[in-house]
Swiss-Prot record:
It comes from Photobacterium profundum (strain SS9). GO terms for biological process: D-amino acid catabolic process. It is found in: Cytoplasm. It catalyses: glycyl-tRNA(Ala) + H2O = tRNA(Ala) + glycine + H(+); a D-aminoacyl-tRNA + H2O = a tRNA + a D-alpha-amino acid + H(+). Homodimer. Keywords: Cytoplasm, Hydrolase, RNA-binding, tRNA-binding. Coiled coil: none annotated. This is D-aminoacyl-tRNA deacylase. The keyword RNA-binding applies. Its EC number is 3.1.1.96. Belongs to the DTD family.
Length: 145
């Protein structure tokens, strides 16, 4: 399971002209699900995403996680993160989870975030989405479990 996380000042996702999720300060989480992923990996990635200390403390050091910084999370499904790009000029998605499995684990990731009492907004799984964000930094990390 892969999360590309970006520290943002604000972010939103729109589907068919309707905003489905919006946050202020926090993390935009682009989530990719692979074939071998399960609930255990989902919880481990949730813990890593929410615990990752990429927000500045009073001394200006990256020392706070999203909850300590008073932020929110916007989770957007992105199957292209599970692409194999090692050869050729066209990505292969053979390592990506089947759509039904990916949706189930995406939903589980969202619920796991909400269980930690953090404001969690979402896009719509497998929809054509427009994602708007204002990067803070920019600060972007690739997390994989």
């Amino acid at each position: 399971m892969i999360a590309l996380i970006q520290r943002v000042s604000e972010a939103s996702v729109t589907v068919d002209g309707q905003v489905t999720g919006t946050i202020g300060k926090g993390l935009l989480v682009l989530l990719g699900v692979e074939k071998e992923d399960d609930e255990s990996k989902t919880k481990r990635l949730r813990d890593k995403v929410l615990g990752y200390r990429i927000f500045e403390d009073d001394a200006g050091k990256m020392n706070l996680n999203v909850q300590q910084a008073g932020g929110s999370v916007l989770v957007v499904s992105q199957f292209t993160l599970a692409a194999d790009t090692k050869s050729g000029m066209r990505p292969s998605f053979s390592v990506g989870a089947a759509p039904a499995d990916a949706e189930r684990l995406y939903d589980y990731f969202v619920e796991c975030c909400k269980d930690k009492d953090i404001q969690t907004e979402t896009g719509i799984f497998a929809a054509d989405m427009k994602v708007a964000l204002l990067n803070d930094g920019p600060v972007t990390f690739w997390l994989q479990v």
